[in-house]
Amino acid sequence: MFYVAVLPVVLIPFILKTMPDSIGFMLKQGRQDELKVIARRLRPDLVIKDDTQLVGNPQIISAQDKPVRSLFLEGRGYSTVMIWMAFMTGLFMVYALNSWLTKLMAMAGFSLGSALNFVIVFNLGSIFGAILGGWLSDKFSIKHVLVVFYVVGAVALTLLGYTRSTELLFVVVFIVGASTLGTQLLAYAYAGDFYPSTIRSTGVGFASGVGRVGAIVAPVLIGALVSMALPLEQNFMAIALAGLIGAVAVTMINQSRSDSAVVRKKATVAHELT
């Protein structure tokens, strides 16, 4: 079974051949010939000679020199902290459930086999949630979709402690998977949307790294609650609380400072000037 872990290694040559580098990275490496090919495809009307030197925006180049500091510049500081909080709570829910869902369902009176089936349904729900969240984010504001997912996750987790019907429990667990693990996958997309390309990798990387605090705390905290022999409902409500905190954190993010909002604003101004 563990040999499955070799599969990503097999994909490395394919990824290296097919995944394109970003324009910013190619500029940094001085790959002028490749950049000119891309520029001619994007703007066939522009005259780009062989001796033309393509350069980056000076402000962007400056930001590349201090990527970590740039996370807190131009009004992004508070929102960066809120993104970290959202990641922490999202990963808290994911790792709490991955670590303790089987045990919690066994505490509810289910056999080990049935409890493991709940884990399978949980992960199937996460696939559905990620796809649905991505589709909804293309139709509506990704921030609003993320807030709704956090709230739905909190509500579903609370209901999980009070649902007694086995059939209904599978439905609720499916929704929990869609709105917790699915939410966390959506959070990565939102962080990427918030930061400009020059610091996008740094922004998403720091959010993911700081968010791991929630992943570390979750199994320990829920384990402590389980050892206290609290009612099952209170264990699920403790996990649900993280969802509510995550929803508040995302709500507090200043969307006007996101890269997508800034780009739209500049495009609107340019259109009005023309």
Task: Annotate each language-model stretch with its function.
Residues 72-131:
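Extracytoplasmic gate region of multi-pass secondary transporters
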Residues 182-195:
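Intracellular juxtamembrane helix-capping segments at the cytosolic ends
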Residues 144-158:
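Structural signature of the two symmetry-related core transmembrane helices
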Residues 162-171:
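Helix-loop junctions at membrane interfaces in 12-TM secondary transporters
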Residues 14-20, 24, 240-268:
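Multi-pass alpha-helical transporter architecture, strongest
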Residues 18-79, 261-274:
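Intracellular cytosolic loops and amphipathic helices of Major Facilitator Superfamily
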Residues 1-5, 226-241:
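A membrane-interface helix-boundary motif in multi-pass transporters
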Residues 105-106, 136-137, 222-230:
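Interfacial helix-cap and linker-helix signal at transmembrane-aqueous boundaries
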